């Protein structure tokens, strides 16, 4: 197969930690031709999708050939693996990738789903599995929810890697001013969730491939921190899935398959769903290292069975 990876500039990739690098190397081991480009390299001339792409040999990291204009219709699979934020440039890239999709190319994850499934709001489809949650921009609503729950976590809807996530108590002085700040004076909604004390034991990143859980790691927060994201100092640990976690995965699977969300990372705290990550989920390297599971190879094998 010919596979194109749309991602951040290769110079920014840390291959020893990066899930996209792991997938590219697994595709190479499967005998596929690997190409890469950034979102700004995508082109549509009329209804013909193209890209100025680089032929790459990702293992060992990395040999890069000269850029070539390629018809996207000539690829079997295109991976959209650009990291958030989901800004204008990101959204326009998904529209250009839809042109390739109409030409018969399998795009992962499906561009329309990348737009529709905000990584915070998408979880609301499965609210029965979540802690009490409120999404609002009105400060009075958020304050009432904080008083009701006592201890809450506030998340920006466009955030990633734990950035901008804060924990507040209802009686905290200056709560109203803080809520005015995070909502930009009630211009933007934020997500408020009941704080789950189980987070001190870690939150679990579960990677689902075509709806099936193929790997997971526990991410334990560092001393004095409640955020467990690896990007803010969390430590990855080996883990196994509990029965409630398997039930969550089973509940999500039909919707993920129907929406074309082939590679997804969900976050679970104390048996409760926190987020559904669809843009460029991480954790492959940690699963492979801690669980001794060839997750990237399994992902490419599953993909080849579907294309």
Curated annotation (Swiss-Prot):
GO terms for molecular function: ATP binding; glutathione synthase activity; metal ion binding. Disulfide bonds: none annotated. It comes from the Bacteria. ATP binds at residues 146-202. Its cofactor is Mg(2+); Mn(2+). The keyword Translocase does not apply. GO terms for cellular component: cytoplasm. PROSITE patterns: ATP_GRASP. Keywords: ATP-binding, Glutathione biosynthesis, Ligase, Magnesium, Manganese, Metal-binding, Nucleotide-binding. Mg(2+) binds at residues 275, 277. Binds 1 Mg(2+) or Mn(2+) ion per subunit. Pfam families: GSH-S_ATP, GSH-S_N. Pathway: Sulfur metabolism; glutathione biosynthesis; glutathione from L-cysteine and L-glutamate: step 2/2. InterPro entries: ATP-grasp, ATP_grasp_subdomain_1, Glut_synth_pro, GSHS_ATP-bd, GSHS_N, PreATP-grasp_dom_sf. Its EC number is 6.3.2.3. The keyword ATP-binding applies. Residues 120-304 form the ATP-grasp domain. It catalyses: gamma-L-glutamyl-L-cysteine + glycine + ATP = glutathione + ADP + phosphate + H(+). Belongs to the prokaryotic GSH synthase family. HAMAP family: GSH_S. This is Glutathione synthetase. The gene is gshB.
């Amino acid at each position: 197969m010919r596979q194109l990876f749309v991602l951040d500039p290769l110079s920014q990739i840390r291959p020893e930690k990066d899930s996209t690098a792991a997938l590219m190397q697994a595709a190479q081991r499967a005998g596929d031709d690997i190409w890469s480009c950034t979102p700004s390299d995508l082109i549509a001339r009329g209804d013909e999708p193209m890209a100025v792409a680089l032929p790459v040999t990702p293992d060992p990291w990395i040999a890069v050939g000269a850029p070539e204009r390629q018809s996207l219709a000539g690829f079997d699979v295109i991976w959209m693996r650009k990291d958030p934020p989901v800004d204008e440039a990101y959204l326009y890239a998904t529209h250009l990738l839809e042109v390739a999709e109409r030409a018969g190319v399998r795009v992962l994850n499906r561009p329309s789903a990348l737009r529709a499934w905000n990584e915070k709001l998408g979880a609301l489809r499965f609210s029965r599995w979540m802690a009490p949650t409120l999404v609002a921009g009105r400060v009075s609503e958020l304050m009432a929810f904080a008083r009701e729950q006592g201890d809450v976590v506030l998340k920006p809807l466009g955030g990633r890697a734990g950035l901008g996530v804060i924990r507040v108590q209802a009686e905290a002085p200056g709560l109203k001013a803080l809520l005015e700040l995070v909502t930009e004076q009630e211009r933007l909604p934020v997500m408020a969730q009941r704080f789950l004390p189980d987070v001190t034991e870690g939150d679990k990143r579960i990677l689902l491939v075509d709806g099936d859980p193929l790997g997971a790691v526990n991410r334990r927060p560092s001393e004095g921190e409640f955020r467990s994201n690896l990007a803010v100092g969390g430590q990855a640990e080996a883990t196994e899935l509990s029965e409630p976690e398997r039930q969550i995965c089973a509940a999500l699977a039909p919707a993920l398959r129907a929406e074309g969300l082939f590679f997804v990372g969900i976050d679970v705290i104390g048996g409760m769903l926190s987020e559904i990550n669809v843009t460029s989920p991480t954790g492959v390297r940690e699963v492979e290292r801690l669980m001794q599971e060839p997750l990237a190879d399994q992902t490419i094998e599953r993909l080849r069975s579907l294309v």
